[in-house]
Structures are given as structure tokens and as C-alpha cells.
Amino acid sequence: MKASEIKGLSRDDLLKREKDAKEELFNLRFQQAAGQLENTARLSTVKKDIARIKTELWAQEIAAEKAKA
């Protein structure tokens, strides 16, 4: 998921995608522990997606605070 795709999403969509990504990360870690994970690069990709989503959520929060002031 690219940052440009994330910027256009609403807060609710971002929260839903964050939840889905965290669930996927949990499942990937479980597969890795069981020795069944084939694509280990997917772990870092999902972590980076979560970071991008959190960054955009934070940016939206800051923008909302600036709009109030």
C-alpha cells in the first residue's frame, strides 16, 4: 500500500485498515513461529503499512487540532 493511497482515506477507513493489517501481522508471526511462513518479506511489508497508516492518522489528528485553533 502506497502512502498516496492512504492519504485519501477517511479516519474510519484508516482505522479499519490498521485493524486488518494488525490481524494479518499476527497471523504471519504465528505462521513464522510454526515454520510455515514462505514469504518472510511480507512481515516487513505489513509492518511498514501499519506505520504508514499510523502516520496518516497522526497527521489528520494534528490537522484537526490546527483547524480548531
Swiss-Prot record:
One of its GO terms (molecular function) is structural constituent of ribosome. SUPFAM superfamilies: Ribosomal protein L29 (L29p) (SSF46561). Keywords: Ribonucleoprotein, Ribosomal protein. Signal peptide: none annotated. One of its GO terms (cellular component) is cytosolic large ribosomal subunit. It comes from the Bacteria. PANTHER family: 60S RIBOSOMAL PROTEIN L35/50S RIBOSOMAL PROTEIN L29, LARGE RIBOSOMAL SUBUNIT PROTEIN UL29C. Belongs to the universal ribosomal protein uL29 family. HAMAP family: Ribosomal_uL29 (MF_00374). One of its GO terms (biological process) is translation. InterPro entries: Ribosomal_protein_uL29 (IPR050063), Ribosomal_uL29 (IPR001854), Ribosomal_uL29_CS (IPR018254), Ribosomal_uL29_sf (IPR036049). Pfam families: Ribosomal_L29 (PF00831). This is Large ribosomal subunit protein uL29.
